[in-house]
Design a protein with these regions (language model features):
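Flexible, glycine/threonine-enriched loop-and-boundary segments that flank and lead into catalytic domains
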Residues: 129-143, 284-329, 335-361, 431, ...
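Short Lys/Arg-enriched alpha/beta "domain-start" segment
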Residues: 1-27
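Active-site catalytic-loop/activation-segment of kinase and kinase-like phosphoryl-transfer enzymes
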Residues: 260-299, 410-428, 455
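Actinobacteria-biased recognition of intrinsically disordered, low-complexity terminal regions
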Residues: 1, 329-336, 477-480
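Short amphipathic beta-strand and strand-loop transition segments with alternating hydrophobic
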Residues: 24-39, 47-49, 299-302
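ATP/Mg2+ or Mg2+-diphosphate-binding catalytic cores
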Residues: 399-436, 440-480
Length: 480
């Protein structure tokens, strides 16, 4: 391996967006290195193939910067984890992840504004992007699987790290929704393609917005502090989110592929649900007490089958963190045509990053998105009990959750009802047929989502484990 490849083999597993944590890296091979700026600080768009000891291969996009002198030292001092390796000699200096260098983010923006072609990379610009904006790109700290650069609180460039063949769903779906006239999501203003993959997408940035998770957990705190026992003041927002979700599903059904009523694939669905349940019970034996009851719900949902006959593209990773409350004046995605102000917008259409691209594109019941949001309400209600994500930090016990059950259940139920009322009313208005047995299917999807959460928390956030376990008990009507 070259010096860069050897260094990347050590560097990549340390990054938060690296998907192969826990796997042994056998080799890294640079497939492409396209110079985007040759003067210092220089920038190259690198695509590296990571081969694992177990035989798998993944491809990663790494913007690689190089600089020397005082500014280089200042960068490495404040972001030492961005350094890939150091070069020696009079022209030496750090080789680093350029997403951490605000000076170099503007190189991507300039190439997009000019719709440039640089070797095998293609930079596309939508005609709706009319404003001229230059300057540094500020890296958002909250990203997990990608890296996002914000320019002037107006634009956001999402750089995809783990690459898969074909068009990224974030680009595919938002472009289709924009074409269908759905304005409650960030329309693409430009994108980067190379080596058969989408490397990045430029979208409007909603400055001053607040995500649904933050807003909901603030309302939960208000609820627990109130003396009258009222379930907080999030229900109006929950109803608005329900209506928005139905509008989103209607737009996706119009703009993207769908399966007509009468073509269910319930056998595959039931097999997947039961397969995941078996896997999670082996990991968390505490779930074994509810296994029979969960299987009964799955069996009844398969036998009824009504709601699953409507299959279409869905969001696929839908929860309170994927919706933003946009303040007055925030976000002008088409250079002067602002989105509707003071309402919710939906973001992040990639689907669950851990799932293969083919699976994320698979047609599914829109009720899976509904189930995801309902489970998010459950998490928000119990979030104040969670002390942290450190595996060494003890989380709430089952008894502690039981003591919170009354006020938490009141908040959950109020917002579930508001969301579902909003969703079903708007879905009915738009002619979306959910089927007469949608409640049974929704319950099965909620249980499946909670079972997945049990597996995730057991592996990654043990202090949170009792939250999905408690959610399963509530869905089954089992006492806390």
């Amino acid at each position: 391996m070259t010096e860069l490849e050897t260094a990347l083999a050590e560097f990549l597993p340390t990054q938060r967006w690296f998907a192969g944590k826990g796997r042994v890296v056998a080799e890294v091979r640079v497939e492409s290195s396209v110079p985007l700026r040759t003067a210092l600080p220089s920038l190259s768009a690198v695509v590296a193939a990571v081969a694992y000891a177990d035989g798998g291969v993944e491809r990663y996009h790494v913007p690689v910067g190089h600089d020397r002198g005082l500014e280089a030292r200042q960068l490495t001092d404040r972001a030492s984890d961005a350094v890939i390796y150091e070069t020696e000699g009079p022209k030496g200096g750090p080789i680093y992840d350029a997403a951490r260098d605000e000076r170099l983010g503007g190189v991507y923006l300039d190439l997009l504004s000019r719709a440039a072609n640089v070797e095998e990379l293609r930079f596309y610009r939508m005609p709706e992007w009319t404003e001229t904006l230059r300057g540094p790109g500020r890296l958002l700290a909250a990203e997990q699987s990608n890296s996002s650069l914000v320019f002037g609180n107006r634009l956001i460039l999402k750089l995809f790290r783990l690459l898969e063949p074909g068009e990224n769903p974030e680009l595919e779906v938002t472009r289709a929704l924009a074409g269908a006239g759905f304005s409650a999501c960030p329309a693409p203003l430009g994108w980067i393609e190379g080596l058969g993959s989408t490397l990045g997408i430029l979208q409007p940035y909603y400055a001053g917005s607040v995500d649904g998770w933050k807003l909901a957990t603030e309302r939960v705190a208000d609820h627990y502090e109130s003396k009258d026992g009222e379930p907080g003041n999030f229900a109006e927002d929950a109803a608005a989110l329900g209506r928005l979700t139905a509008e989103l599903h209607g737009a996706m059904a119009t703009a993207l592929p769908k399966v007509a009523e009468g073509q269910p694939d319930l056998g595959r669905l039931s097999g997947r649900l039961l397969g995941q349940l078996t896997q999670v019970v082996a990991l968390v034996p505490e779930l074994a007490d509810q296994r029979e009851a969960i299987e009964e719900v799955y069996t009844k949902a398969e036998a009824a089958g009504g709601g699953s006959r409507h299959l279409q593209r869905i969001h696929g990773d839908y929860h309170l963190g994927q919706v933003l409350k946009v303040p007055e004046g925030s976000g002008e995605p088409r250079g002067g045509a602002p989105v509707d102000r003071g309402r919710w917008v939906v973001i992040d259409f990639e689907g669950e990053p851990a799932r293969p691209l083919e699976e994320r594109r698979r047609l599914a019941s829109p009720l899976q998105d509904v189930a995801g949001m309902l489970r998010s309400f459950d998490y928000a209600a119990f979030q104040p009990l969670v002390l942290g994500e450190d595996p060494e930090t003890p989380g709430p016990t089952r008894d502690e959750l039981a003591r919170f059950e009354g006020p938490a259940a009141a908040w959950i139920e109020a917002n579930r009802k508001a969301f579902l009322d909003g969703y079903l009313t708007r879905a009915g208005d738009s002619g979306q047929a959910l089927g007469g047995d949608h409640e049974l299917l929704l319950r099965a999807f909620e249980l499946d989502k909670a079972v997945y959460e049990v597996m995730y928390e057991a592996r990654h956030r043990p202090p949170w484990l009792q939250i999905p376990l408690g959610g399963i008990r509530r869905l089954l009507g089992v006492s806390p």
